[in-house]
Structures are given as C-alpha cells and as structure tokens.
C-alpha cells in the first residue's frame, strides 16, 4: 500500500493556552485498508502530521535542526485504537504536553471524530532533544524552553488521562 499525495492539516489555535491545540483533517481514500477502515499505519501518519504542526509552535519545527543544530528523536510511543473511522470522515486531534525536563518531552495526542467527538485513538510519545554535532542527548536551547515551559504549566492544570504510562501485556487471572 503506497501513500497518496498528502496535504498538511489545517491547524487552528485558540488564544488561550488552556485550549489545547486542535488540528482538523479528513480520512483519505488511500488510508483505507482491506477491512474497509483506516489502516493502523495511517493513524501513525495522522499523528505525525500533527506532531510537525505542534512542534512548530514549541520552537521545534522543521527549521530546528538547521537553526539550533539539534533535533527531536522519538524514544517510544504507545497508540490506543479505540474506534474505527472510514473514508471521508472528519478527525480532530489535540495535543497535551504531559511533562518536560531539560532534554525530554512527553505528550499525548488525542484523536476524536470530527462530528460527534467520540474518542478514536490516542498516541502517547516520549521524545528527546539530540545534538546533531555528536548525536547525543542535549539540553533544550533556552528559546525552546521559553516556549515549552508556559505550555507545560498550563497543561499541568488538565487531567492526566488514565491511559498515560501504561504497559502492553496480556492480563492473566489467577486460576
């Protein structure tokens, strides 16, 4: 399955930091698999498109490697697939900054259906700032910290979703 041409999503920000950034997009025909619903790979793609947009507002956009000689590498992610979506359906994705330290960010994308706001999927990510000079972890530049800190302070006021930090395993009952 080869991806078709993609259009970057339109990103809408409210004036308040308390209003989570929201990206709207539509399920494309080429994202549909043999089961008739959106393929798991395209959930990752949709979340990645949103990541690029959110990173731009956090000072970590596509110009970050050239501007600061740093990059953001993903250390790990969890995706929860909650409900199916189909060709042409609208999606809305928000991003909550869960935690930040001197070189890492931990955030959660939440995808809901654009019509009825039902939960579709969640994507939890842990990422690290990397110096491109030595390919090792490095502290965020102050310009990035100055953008991340106020967002984090506001997002700390939001509820932490139950799914955050969970591990994947088959639960076994004692018999």
Could you describe each region identified by the protein language model?
Residues 2-92, 98-175:
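Terminal targeting signals and extreme-terminal segments of soluble enzymes
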């Amino acid at each position: 399955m080869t991806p078709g041409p993609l259009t970057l999503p339109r990103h809408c920000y409210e004036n308040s930091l308390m209003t989570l950034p929201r990206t709207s997009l539509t399920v494309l025909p080429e994202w549909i698999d043999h089961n008739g619903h959106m393929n798991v790979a395209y959930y990752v793609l949709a979340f990645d498109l949103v990541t690029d947009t959110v990173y731009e507002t956090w000072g970590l956009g596509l110009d970050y490697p050239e501007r600061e000689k740093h990059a953001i590498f993903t250390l790990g992610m969890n995706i929860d697939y909650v409900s199916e979506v189909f060709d042409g359906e609208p999606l809305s994705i928000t991003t909550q900054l869960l935690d930040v330290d001197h070189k890492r960010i931990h955030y959660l994308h939440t995808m809901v259906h654009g019509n009825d706001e039902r939960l579709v999927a969640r994507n939890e990510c842990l990422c690290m700032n990397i110096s491109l000079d030595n390919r090792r972890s490095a502290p965020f530049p102050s310009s990035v910290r100055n953008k991340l800190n106020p967002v984090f302070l506001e997002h700390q006021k939001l509820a932490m979703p139950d799914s955050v930090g969970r591990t994947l395993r088959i639960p076994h009952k004692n018999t």
